[in-house]
């Protein structure tokens, strides 16, 4: 039997939580002119997960890879077994591959290839996931001078200029972990 996206998601989340510990998932996240199936946040990275079930084709994958590479620190393609033979032809070498198969009543996962750091990621685009108040929280913590009346784009640029990348990675992850959807967004 073929695995569909809906069969893969929840078991995938459980697999990654067991494997990695503290993670947070955001589904169907807009990234430029594409949509990430899953954005996963760890303590110091934001990771893109593109699901290619047995029913999916590679038609949009080339364009999706371009956008994933702009936004995420690491990227994985999660594939049904029908894609195992040819997936490497369609993704960069630094992308990870997680294969999933049916095993009785469960979905089994295997990390076929670990993802390497994505050097094409644009910090400004990664920071665009943050709401204004999250950017302001980072600014209050890290920037000595007060900058008022900055647009979100100007605030992101100022933080990139003033705060080292490793610190920003951790602070972005913290803000995404702490995000509260019960309060109003900006």
At which residue positions do the language-model features occur?
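Active-site metal-binding core of divalent-cation-utilizing nuclease and nuclease-like domains
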Residues: 3-43, 47, 158
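Catalytic cores of nucleic-acid endonucleases
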Residues: 56-100
């Amino acid at each position: 039997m073929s695995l569909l996206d809906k069969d893969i998601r929840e078991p995938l989340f459980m697999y990654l939580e067991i494997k990695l510990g503290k993670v947070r998932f955001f589904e169907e996240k807009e990234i430029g002119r594409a949509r990430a199936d899953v954005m996963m946040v760890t303590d110091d990275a934001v990771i893109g997960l593109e699901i290619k079930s047995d029913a999916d084709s590679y038609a949009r994958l080339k364009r999706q890879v371009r956008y994933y590479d702009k936004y995420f620190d690491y990227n994985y393609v999660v594939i049904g077994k029908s894609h195992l033979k040819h997936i490497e032809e369609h993704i960069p070498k630094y992308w990870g591959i997680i294969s999933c198969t049916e095993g009785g009543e469960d979905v089994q996962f295997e990390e076929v290839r670990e993802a390497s750091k994505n050097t094409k990621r644009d910090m400004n685009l990664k920071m665009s996931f943050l709401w204004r108040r999250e950017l302001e929280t980072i600014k209050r913590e890290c920037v000595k001078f007060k900058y008022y009346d900055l647009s979100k784009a100007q605030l992101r640029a100022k933080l990139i200029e003033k705060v080292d990348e490793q610190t920003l990675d951790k602070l972005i992850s913290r803000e995404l972990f702490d995000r509260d959807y019960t309060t109003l967004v900006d």
